[in-house]
């Protein structure tokens, strides 16, 4: 698609989290967007999605990271914490190695409060590839409610256990 259109691509490809470096070398005009969000909000969302999609918090839901066989042996919260850490490790590694002109990192709350600032960044990235992009201005919107602090202690324990028990891929 990129070669056919001769245009840069902006993508959010969760399935590619562990292969972004290879993808960037195949598509040098691709732009990779990383949306950073409060880790506790992310793990709470993933945890709730298990129940929503399967009716059971214990059943795996989402992509299987390279550490899946280790994670699936752990309790549900630790599985979710491990999935989050695996994704973050892969994205950290990728965004360190992919050229800056191909990446955008945006904070979720900042994006919600000022989406037009993100649009300016996106327009600038496209311009760097010789492509003009004009996005309509939009009004800020309210970020989804955070998880609060009630689960923070439980999740911190889950993160600690996973970091001790799971051998994460060293990139």
Where are these regions (language model features)?
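Long, well-ordered mid-to-C-terminal structural blocks that present hydrophobic/aromatic surfaces
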Residues: 22-65
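Short, flexible loop/turn elements at secondary-structure junctions
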Residues: 14-17, 39, 110-112
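PAPS-dependent sulfotransferases, especially Golgi type II membrane carbohydrate sulfotransferases
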Residues: 47-171
């Amino acid at each position: 698609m990129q070669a056919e259109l001769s245009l840069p691509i902006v993508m959010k490809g969760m399935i590619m989290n562990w292969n972004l470096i290879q993808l960037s070398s195949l598509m040098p005009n691709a732009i990779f967007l990383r949306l950073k969000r409060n880790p506790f909000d992310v793990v709470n969302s993933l945890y709730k999605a298990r129940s929503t999609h399967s009716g059971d918090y214990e059943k795996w839901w989402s992509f299987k990271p390279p550490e899946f066989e280790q994670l699936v042996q752990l309790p549900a919260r630790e599985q979710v914490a491990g999935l989050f850490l695996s994704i973050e490790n892969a994205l950290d590694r990728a965004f360190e190695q992919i050229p800056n002109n191909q990446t955008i990192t945006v904070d979720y709350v900042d994006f919600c409060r000022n989406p037009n600032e993100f649009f300016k960044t996106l327009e600038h990235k496209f311009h760097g590839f010789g492509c003009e992009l004009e996005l309509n201005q939009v009004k800020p919107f309210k970020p989804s409610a955070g998880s609060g602090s009630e689960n923070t202690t439980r999740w911190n324990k889950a993160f600690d256990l996973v970091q001790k028990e799971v051998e994460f891929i060293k990139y």
